[in-house]
Swiss-Prot record:
Region spans: G2: 509-513
Subcellular location field: Cytoplasm
Subcellular location, principal: cytoplasm
Compositionally skewed regions (Basic and acidic residues) per UniProt: 48-63, 120-177, 212-263
Protein name: Translation initiation factor IF-2
């Protein structure tokens, strides 16, 4: 979401709007309220201000990289015990950056971290800034309390020191005065006693008063000096405390501002170099302090005051002890040339003291960050922290997705997805493709949100292109489809209009392809589509109705409304296309146009004279009667429709028919619906794409361009497109290839996913059905529409016992690969208007493959139907040949029971089966064991003769039983 005002920008940065207004005013951007507009320039000025306040500089820093290489040899024994000398080369690389002079301002004195540290700490800086702000808040509170205590203690200490100093000076003055008095006394002793006594008596009071006056003056001066020093110390301590509080406040504000700046920079695409704020450091050992105070070649030393101000803030406040006074930096200096400071790792200089806890919240942890992590490198950028709560992800699930990709989207292992699917009762592998519904169930099962979406679908660009086209709409010719039942004269009617003879050259006198022609009439151009009338070409007729503007429904006057006539009416009504009825064959004596009208009214097509909206025109394709009236009505309907299409725009159309020509390659008949198709255009048709190399009209003549409603044949596609596919002209062949490959993969993945989902169901169906005969077929046709119609017609022949299995169907001639496939699958090859080449014929003869050629769809369907009938199991029927009555029963040793019988009806044969009836109830069914007349075995006994009969495995024969004699015959079945 683009932030247009201060309030929106503050919500985006997750900070109060008032704080943002203060920062904007500090940056020189005058914004008074939250509703003020905010431009990109204002944001840039705010970012520059924040960077400068954090110490970022624009100047390039000079740096030098030094590499040291050291080679040594070591000897090591291998597995055989033999000593080997190994060359070991150690390379060390250090980068030194020249910093600014130490005497510059505080922003220039701050140490800029190296690029590697900045990149590593950029990701965790926001969390660290928050922790540092909380820590600084605590430290500020405790610092204020400690500072007050320090001020009081410092004032008392200095007062005591001043008082002691004044007392010492006063004692020295008294001692000096005493020594002077003693010297004078010694000099006076040499004089006369009288005079000395007199002088002593006179000078003693004066001397005492002088000493008292000098002592009082010295005390007053000492008190004034002590008070002045105490006042200076208190003022200095207060200034220092205020400076430290101001520094803490600035650092807290800087940390918060830096966190906001980091959030903004993480959202921007370009990489912004932000100078990192130096985090507070714990107290350091003397060696590290000396190195820091002096500085190295690439790290300047800090001033003593700054180091002393930074140390109390980083020390743990719970200790309660006052901070030690900062010693002068010059007392603990270390020369750069001594030791290993030039090649030593920076982390050695940042080694902290041992503490019971980390007061910095993990901000300052380096190579040896804590007491238990000594010697271990824990890089915070690469260390993993387990989430405290489960992460719910939004998973975009395409139409098909593999198990591995689905697991990757959820950031889990593929084995977890496989486990869940096993619990759901489906065994999958890591590379198996799942359909969208199954994948979404798995995502929900694992606790994530599943969204059905098409990510990176290149076809979305096509929709955007359609919306953006605003070319001028111009009138276009109408597209008229001729539909009707087979043999009702559709092609003959078009032949008369076009003055051509297409019908005479068609196999069997029927149309088996969809044809496209355009005819110039005195009133304009009309494009005709001729569709087949056979029931097998339903899909072809549906495509014709989809691409048309007007339908001419041809009905034979002597035949009336037939099944395909009704189907054509339903296609036209489904497409919302007006119908013009042509009642053909009115020249025949048995023609009855009135009956045709009544039948069409029953189907919902009402003529104009009956109050409907469908013109009925009686015509004769043989004599030409009524043809002009038919064209007049068609053009009248076209004027009412006001057909328009853009001309000066990329072409769009539909594939009417497609085929594979041996010399030309894939050829597609395209009806242009809008725009202009030119030679050299890049076209996309379904999964096929390519550049138009050649373009022919319906007469086979080359043409350079085709406008709306004009049918043309184009060459140059990558493969044979599907009939009915939409044709689009694209400006870029790379984009066309991308969309075509995407469609191919999508079609293949969806097909595989559906096959996988239906495996279990089909397995159960086959188990329930038992043994089913399969007739494998390979179908090669001349055009896509014929191949589609033939496949659908043959699949309809399948029954519960015999099933047609289409192993492969395609457009083009029969090749060696087709014969090899037929050999492997034991299939029969059917060529519809195609032939096999020489190599394929030789291979088929060698392998015994049956190749059948047809040019009429009836013949192909009938022969396949006959072959399937031969595969059916024969039907067994029982035929009763005679009836026998038992007159007497004989018990014969070693033979069994023999019945003396009379043949009452028909004939009894030795090979017949017998059914025993007792009281008209069947009690046994079996075979004859013997058939005798007197003592001779006979083959048959006719009606009216007596015979003796014995049955296999049945001796319970009673007088009065009847034997029904029958034979089982097998009858061939048909579909």
């Amino acid at each position: 979401m683009a932030s247009n005002n201060v309030a929106q920008f503050a919500a985006e940065l997750k900070m109060p709007a008032g704080v943002l207004l203060e920062q904007l005013q500090a940056a020189g951007v005058q914004k008074a309220s939250e509703d003020d507009a905010l431009s990109e320039t204002d944001k840039a000025r705010l970012l520059d201000h924040l960077r400068k306040s954090h110490g970022a500089t624009d100047g390039d820093k000079r740096k030098i990289t030094l590499t040291r290489r050291h080679t040594s040899e070591i000897k090591q024994a291998d597995a055989t015990g033999k000593a080997r000398t190994i060359q070991v080369e150690v390379r060390k690389k250090r980068t030194f950056v020249k910093r600014d002079d130490v005497s510059e301002t505080g922003a220039d004195q701050a140490q800029a971290q190296t690029d590697e540290q900045a990149e590593a700490e950029l990701k965790r800086r926001e969390e660290e800034a928050r922790r540092e702000a909380e820590l600084l808040e605590k430290q500020a509170q405790e610092l204020r309390e400690r500072q007050e205590r320090l001020e009081r203690e410092e004032a008392e200490r200095r007062a005591r020191e001043e008082a002691a100093e004044a007392e010492r000076r006063r004692a020295e003055e008294e001692a000096a005065a005493k020594r002077a008095a003693a010297a004078q006394a010694e000099a006076a002793q040499q004089a006369a006693a009288a005079r000395e006594q007199a002088q002593r008596a006179q000078s003693e009071p004066a001397e005492q008063s002088a000493q008292d006056e000098a002592r009082a003056a010295a005390e007053r001066a000492a008190q004034r000096e002590a008070a002045k020093k105490a006042e200076d110390a208190a003022r200095e301590a207060a200034d220092k405390a205020r400076a430290e509080q101001e520094e803490i406040r600035k650092r807290r504000e800087a940390a918060e501002a830096e966190a906001r700046a980091i959030r903004e920079m993480m959202n921007t695409p370009r990489r912004a170099q932000v100078k990192a704020v130096e985090p507070p450091k714990p107290a350091e050992p003397p060696a590290a302090k000396a190195a820091e105070a002096k500085g190295t070649l690439h790290k300047p030393a800090k001033p003593a005051g700054e180091a002393a101000a930074a140390r109390p803030a980083a020390k743990k406040p719970a200790s309660g002890a006052p901070a030690p006074a900062a010693a002068p930096a010059g007392d603990r200096t270390k020369k750069p040339g001594t030791g290993k400071s030039g090649w030593q790792d920076d982390a050695a200089k940042r080694r902290g003291i041992k503490t019971r806890g980390d007061s910095s919240g993990g901000v300052d942890r380096g190579w040896r960050g804590g007491p238990k992590g000594r010697g271990k490198h824990q890089d915070s950028a690469s260390s993993f922290q387990a989430p405290t709560e489960p992460i719910v992800r939004e998973v975009h699930v395409p139409e098909t997705i593999s198990v591995a990709d689905l697991a990757h989207k959820m950031s889990i292992k593929a084995s977890e997805v496989i486990k869940v699917m096993m619990k759901m009762g489906q065994m999958v592998t890591i590379n198996q493709v799942l359909d969208q519904e199954t994948a979404m169930i798995v995502v929900e099962e694992l606790g994530h949100r599943a969204l059905a979406a098409k990510l990176d679908d290149p076809e979305a660009l096509l929709v955007e292109g359609e919306i953006g086209s605003d070319a001028e709409q111009l009138p276009r010719p109408p597209v008229v489809t001729v539909m009707g039942h087979v043999d009702h004269g559709k092609t003959s009617l078009l032949d008369y209009i076009r003055r051509a003879k297409v019908a005479a050259g068609e196999a069997g006198g029927i149309t088996q392809h969809i044809g496209a022609y355009h005819v110039e009439t005195p009133r304009g151009v009309v494009t005709f589509l001729d569709t087949p009338g056979h029931e097998a070409f339903t899909a072809m007729r549906a495509r014709g109705a989809k691409a048309t503007d007007i339908v001419i429904l041809v009905v034979a006057a002597d035949d009336g409304v037939m099944p395909q006539t009704k189907e054509a009416i339903s296609h036209a009504k489904a497409g919302g296309v007006p119908i013009v009825v042509a009642i053909n064959k009115i020249d025949k004596p048995e023609a009855n146009p009135d009956r045709v009208k009544q039948e069409l009214v029953a189907e919902g097509v009402v003529p104009e004279e009956y109050g409907g909206d469908s013109p009925f025109v009686p015509v004769s394709a043989k004599t030409g009667a009524g043809i002009d009236d038919l064209l007049e009505n068609v053009l009248l309907q076209a004027e009412v429709l006001e057909l328009k299409a853009p001309v000066e725009s990329p072409a769009k159309g539909i594939v009417i028919e497609a085929k594979l020509d041996k010399g030309k390659g894939p050829v597609a008949t395209v009806l242009v619906q809008s725009g202009t198709l030119s030679r050299g255009d890049v076209v996309l048709a379904g999964t096929a794409y390519g550049r138009v190399r050649a373009m022919l009209d319906e007469n086979g003549k080359p043409t350079k361009e085709a406008g709306p409603s004009i049918p043309v044949e184009i060459q140059g596609l990558s493969e044979v497109p599907g009939a009915g596919e939409e044709v689009i002209v694209l400006p870029d062949e790379r984009k066309a290839r991308e969309i075509a490959l995407f469609r191919q993969g999508k079609f293949r993945d969806v097909k595989l996913a559906k096959q996988q989902a239906a495996k279990l169901e089909s397995m159960l169906e086959q188990m329930g059905e038992g043994e089913v005969q399969n007739l494998p077929l390979i179908i090669k046709a001349d055009v896509q529409g014929s191949q589609e119609a033939l496949v659908q017609s043959l699949l309809k022949l399948s029954t519960d016992e015999v099933r047609v299995q289409i192993v492969h169907s395609a457009v083009g001639g029969i090749s060696e690969s087709d014969v090899n496939l037929a050999t492997a699958s034991k299939a029969v090859i059917i060529g519809f208007n195609t032939r096999a080449d020489a190599q394929a014929r030789k291979l088929a003869e060698a392998n015994g493959i049956d190749i059948r050629y047809y040019n009429i769809i009836y013949d192909a369907v009938d022969e396949v139907k006959a072959a399937m009938s031969g595969m059916l199991a024969p039907e067994k029927r029982e035929v009763v040949t005679g009836m026998v009555e038992v007159r007497q029963v004989f018990k014969v040793p070693k033979v069994g029971t023999v019945a003396g019988c009379m043949v009452t009806d028909g004939v009894v044969k030795r090979s017949s089966s017998v059914r025993v009836l007792r009281n008209n109830v069947v009690i046994f069914t079996g075979e004859l064991d013997s058939l005798k007349r007197f003592k001779d075995d006979v083959k048959e006994v006719k009606q009216g003769f007596e015979c003796g009969m014995s049955l296999k495995n049945f001796n319970d024969i009673v007088e009065g039983d009847q034997f029904e004699v029958f034979e089982v015959t097998e009858v061939a079945r048909t579909l």
